[in-house]
Design a protein with these regions (language model features):
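Gly/Ala-rich beta-loop-alpha elbow adjacent to hydrolase catalytic centers
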Residues: 155-159, 163
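Short, surface-exposed "cap/lid" segments of acyl-processing enzymes
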Residues: 47-50, 59-100
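A short, hydrophobic beta-strand-centered structural micro-motif
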Residues: 284-291, 334-360, 368
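Extended, Lys/Arg-enriched charged tracts that mediate electrostatic binding to polyanionic substrates
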Residues: 16-53
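A structural "domain/chain start" motif
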Residues: 189, 269-318, 419-428
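Short beta-strand->alpha-helix linker/helix-N-cap micro-motif
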Residues: 310-334
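Serine hydrolase/lipase
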Residues: 64, 93-112, 119-154, 168-285
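C-terminal/domain-edge helix-coil "capping" segments
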Residues: 276-284, 343, 364, 374-428
Length: 428
């Protein structure tokens, strides 16, 4: 459960990044943790392909993890795929058989899939997944044959449907079920009930939705004859964000929250080492103070933002001491904090404040990270505020990550020992 929750957060970050692959801070963030990412585009005249291929090695499990992420709907071509709701016959173990069967009428009690999703996956297969003899090639051949390789297929909305159906096709083409997992976010059903019954158990599918997202059930509701399958994971969504219930940024927030819950559970059971508030190496020690404004402390998701920020500071700093986490606002002066930091043995003091201010008459707020760095003598080395406009309850972790990315650059200018590249690690 813990490993699944960990890779769900990675998949969610990648699903955000694939929408803007060349400027994505989510991809930059993943790269800083060792992920090698390449975006892929293609067009066969009918279907426009947009996905990303990433890989990273995890020494704790001795696995080379490959992550293939399909973009959700973002163009007219994508919506043509979505609206091609006619069902086509499903089956076959070669491209020729698949194409031939899809052209035939769906028999009574036969397995059938969404015509648009099927054409998209067919284009993916022809783009380099298989050769002219319908044998796995390249990346997918390597994954299938390498005992230390494992594949994660993922996507949001249309991307999730693509990942699901591609997973089914890979099994039909000879890839063992045990070699991969499919993780989807807000994805519609891909086939009818016969397809779900005959093929649903052929892949490991983690199907993530939420209590307010209409897309996963849209085909069943509006067109009928479609059925979901796989392991359902449903996030309980606040009614305050009903207009953003399908946003990938929302799924990212909730995946982080669920990951923290699972991490805490594993720590309480003794399966993971507790996160330390003190790490001392030969590098200078930095005392870290993180606080949120009084107006934010009552909001449940702010706890996740603080944990995310603290985790990132831990990874940036070779030597650190996490000081009082819930510092009362204005309870201490800067000089008081400096004295406490020096007494703890710190050479530097890093103060971070997390603020959220709602714009008048707007349904959005500005999530701001205020960061100040001082040496032990009180000399201010850098100070700055980094903000993002977000919904009050959606996109906060994404915004916090973007703010932290800028904040880290400011620290790098003053502290040459800041760590910007990290080894992939399942611990936290």
């Amino acid at each position: 459960a813990y490993v699944q929750s960990y890779f769900t957060t990675i998949a969610a970050a990648s699903c955000l990044g694939v929408y803007l692959p060349h400027t994505s801070q989510e991809f930059d963030y993943l790269r800083s943790y060792g992920w090698q990412i390449e975006s892929q585009q293609g067009n066969d005249g009918k279907v426009e392909l947009n996905y990303a291929v990433a890989k990273n090695y995890f020494p704790q499990i001795n696995k080379q993890i490959y992550l293939v992420t399909f973009r959700g709907s973002a163009s007219k071509s994508d919506w043509k795929i979505n609206l091609a709701t006619k069902k086509v016959n499903y089956g076959g173990s070669t491209l020729a058989e698949m194409h031939e069967l899809a052209a035939q009428p769906v028999p009574k009690d036969g397995a059938a899939v969404h015509a648009g999703f099927n054409s998209y996956v067919d284009a993916v297969l022809r783009s380099g997944v298989v050769d002219e003899n319908s044998k796995l090639r390249g990346l997918f051949k390597r994954i299938s044959e390498d005992p230390d390789a494992y594949l994660v297929l993922t996507g949001h909305s249309l991307g999730g449907a693509t990942a699901t159906l591609l997973g089914e096709r890979l099994v039909s083409l000879g890839m063992p079920k045990e070699k991969f997992v499919v993780i989807t976010f807000g994805a519609p059903a891909v086939g009818n009930s016969v397809f779900a019954e005959q093929y649903g158990n052929k892949i490991k599918l983690v199907r993530i939705s939420n209590t307010a997202d209409p897309v996963p059930g849209s085909l069943q509701t509006f067109f009928g004859g479609y059925k979901q399958f796989g392991e359902p994971v449903k996030y309980s969504l606040s009614n305050k964000i009903s207009n953003l219930q399908h946003a990938m940024a929302m799924y990212f927030d909730y995946s982080i929250s669920e990951y923290y819950k699972e991490r805490d559970k594993q720590i309480s059971m003794g399966r993971l080492e507790p996160v330390t508030d003190r790490k001392i190496t030969q590098q200078p020690v930095v005392a870290v103070w993180v606080n949120t404004s009084d107006s934010l402390k009552k909001l449940a998701y702010v706890t996740d933002i603080k944990r995310f920020v603290l985790d990132e500071y831990r990874k940036m700093l070779p030597s650190y001491i996490i000081m009082e986490r819930n510092l009362p606002k204005d309870a201490y002066t800067t000089q008081d904090l400096l004295k406490l930091s020096r007494d703890a043995g710190a050479e530097y003091m890093l103060v971070c404040g997390i603020e959220g201010n709602q714009a008048p008459k707007e349904g959005y707020w500005y999530l701001t990270l205020e960061q100040g760095l001082f040496d032990k003598n009180g000399r201010m080395l850098t100070i700055g505020a980094f903000g993002r406009k977000v919904s009050p309850a959606v996109g906060n972790i994404q915004a916090a990550g973007e703010n932290l990315w800028q904040a880290r650059e400011a620290l790098c200018e003053q502290l040459p020992f800041i760590v910007t590249q990290h080894e992939a690690h399942l611990g936290y």
